């Protein structure tokens, strides 16, 4: 299979899975394994196409991101979504990522560990659906600092490949009495700084694997993931309120079973 086709396929996978509760990292590892596209070059490629998904969220939520630069609501202690909410949502995952980054990259980026993460994340999502109570926050401006921190702590689970950042944070939001839409939007916003930081760190460590010859492949993957992520996020927000997390959880379990039976055994 040509590099361009591989880039196109993985770009679609990244764009679809990055902000859906199905684990983009897990899917990239599993699909990369099936395509025979693995190793350091593959890891560097994954970093680049994640930037495409990051750019999609930055554009979709640019007004909200710009508003976070206004510190007046924070200084006046207004009950309005502000930068401190984002800090509380990001800080736990940053600490966990810095402490565990090398261990995770060395030992956990394997197909069998992803299968475990897919199932564990699915169990959390089903648990959140069963145990969720009536929401008290229906918009980002309703979000309390305690709810933001709770969601941030759940984001730490996403350092394990296959668990899913969106799945973890949206589940945490439901358990903290945040509705689907608000939990999803907050999940997207706190994913940005974490992804930028993690991607930047990975890029610094992987830049030696970049080659001028790889530019066409990387460009196709980047552009594809950007376009697909834009479409996926808009569609997901509309879909989630109708169907909830359970269908995504069942898909994760089915994928884990099929991959184990047909590939790992």
From Swiss-Prot:
Superkingdom as given in the UniProt entry: Bacteria
Keyword Membrane on entry: yes
Topology of this chain in the membrane: Multi-pass membrane protein
GO molecular function: undecaprenyl-diphosphatase activity
Pfam families per the UniProt record, alphabetical: BacA (PF02673)
Entry EC no(s): 3.6.1.27
EC top class, as a word: hydrolase
Cell compartments where the protein resides: Cell membrane
GO BP annotations, alphabetical order: cell wall organization; peptidoglycan biosynthetic process; regulation of cell shape; response to antibiotic
Residue stretches spanning the membrane: 4-24, 42-62, 84-104, 108-128, 184-204, 217-237, 245-265
Catalytically driven reaction(s): di-trans,octa-cis-undecaprenyl diphosphate + H2O = di-trans,octa-cis-undecaprenyl phosphate + phosphate + H(+)
GO cellular component entries: plasma membrane
Main subcellular localisation: membrane
Keyword list, A-Z: Antibiotic resistance, Cell membrane, Cell shape, Cell wall biogenesis/degradation, Hydrolase, Membrane, Peptidoglycan synthesis, Transmembrane, Transmembrane helix
Comment field (misc): Bacitracin is thought to be involved in the inhibition of peptidoglycan synthesis by sequestering undecaprenyl diphosphate, thereby reducing the pool of lipid carrier available.
General function of this protein: Catalyzes the dephosphorylation of undecaprenyl diphosphate (UPP). Confers resistance to bacitracin.
UniProt-listed HAMAP family: Undec_diphosphatase
Membership in a protein family: Belongs to the UppP family.
Record's protein name: Undecaprenyl-diphosphatase 1
Gene name of this polypeptide: uppP1
């Amino acid at each position: 299979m040509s590099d361009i086709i591989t880039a196109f396929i993985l770009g679609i996978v990244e764009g679809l899975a990055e902000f859906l509760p199905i684990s983009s990292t897990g899917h990239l590892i599993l699909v990369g394994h099936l395509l025979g596209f693995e190793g350091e070059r593959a890891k560097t490629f994954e970093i680049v196409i994640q930037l495409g998904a990051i750019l999609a969220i930055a554009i979709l939520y640019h007004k909200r991101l710009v508003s976070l630069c206004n510190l007046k609501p924070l200084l006046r202690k207004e009950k309005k979504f502000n930068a401190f909410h984002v800090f509380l949502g990001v800080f736990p995952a940053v600490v966990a990522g810095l402490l565990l980054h090398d261990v995770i990259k060395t030992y956990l980026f394997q197909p069998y560990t992803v299968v475990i993460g897919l199932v564990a994340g699915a169990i959390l999502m089903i648990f959140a659906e069963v145990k969720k109570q009536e929401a008290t926050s229906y918009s980002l401006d309703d979000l309390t600092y305690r709810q933001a921190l709770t969601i941030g702590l759940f984001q730490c689970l996403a350092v394990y490949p296959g668990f899913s950042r969106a799945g973890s944070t949206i589940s945490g939001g439901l358990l903290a009495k945040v509705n689907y839409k608000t939990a999803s939007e907050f999940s997207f916003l706190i994913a940005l700084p974490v992804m930028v930081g993690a991607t930047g760190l990975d890029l610094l460590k992987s830049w030696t694997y970049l080659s001028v010859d790889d530019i066409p492949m990387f460009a196709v993957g980047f552009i594809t993931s950007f376009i697909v992520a834009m479409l996926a996020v808009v569609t997901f927000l509309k879909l989630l309120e109708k169907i909830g997390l359970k269908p995504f959880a069942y898909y994760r379990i089915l994928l884990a079973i099929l991959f184990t039976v047909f590939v790992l055994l």
